[in-house]
Amino acid sequence: MGVTRIGLLGGSFDPVHVAHIALADTARQFLGLDQVQLIPAANPWQRQPLKASAPHRLRMLELAIAGHPALAINPVEIERGGATYTADTVRALPGGPQYFWLLGTDQLQNFCTWRDWQDIAARIELAVATRPGASIAPPAELATWLAAHRRQLHELPFAPMAVSASDIRQRLAADAATDGLLPEPVAAYIATHHLYR
């Protein structure tokens, strides 16, 4: 029996949308992951304040991953509370599995601004979602660190989807259609609880 391989997808999930689930499923298949854990932020330090409460965001995640047995929710950041730093989350991971932090090319370009980014890169693998056929271009500081430590970035071919949580929130606030942007149970939950209005 080999080492368990776990993908980690952090985010505000405010709200969780179809691209989040598609990325998690693609990563699981392409990287041969046993599980992908979605980690909702308590208070992301680089973002605007969250619109939906932690209980609402957790419930929407539960609804979104129903029917996806290899996806799970890891509430560590919400349970810890306060400012959310990836380094703290990574340090709290139990030993044993091989972990892959899933990030987009925009996050990759900002990675060296993350608190204790070298510690993150030393502890877990970094998997970057890229357009199919595109190559990864890490910032120079990260590229130098990776070469010095004989580490590499894992490419995750993922066709970009024209969906963002901020756009969805704007649409919901304007009572505009969000068809195809949200998992259906999440859309129903948002409507029932009058979120993002």
From Swiss-Prot:
Pathway: Cofactor biosynthesis; NAD(+) biosynthesis; deamido-NAD(+) from nicotinate D-ribonucleotide: step 1/1. It catalyses: nicotinate beta-D-ribonucleotide + ATP + H(+) = deamido-NAD(+) + diphosphate. The keyword NAD applies. InterPro entries: Cyt_trans-like, NadD/NMNAT, Rossmann-like_a/b/a_fold. Its EC number is 2.7.7.18. Coiled coil: none annotated. One of its GO terms (molecular function) is nicotinate-nucleotide adenylyltransferase activity. It comes from the Bacteria. GO terms for biological process: NAD biosynthetic process. Keywords: ATP-binding, NAD, Nucleotide-binding, Nucleotidyltransferase, Pyridine nucleotide biosynthesis, Transferase. Belongs to the NadD family. Catalyzes the reversible adenylation of nicotinate mononucleotide (NaMN) to nicotinic acid adenine dinucleotide (NaAD). HAMAP family: NaMN_adenylyltr. This is Probable nicotinate-nucleotide adenylyltransferase.
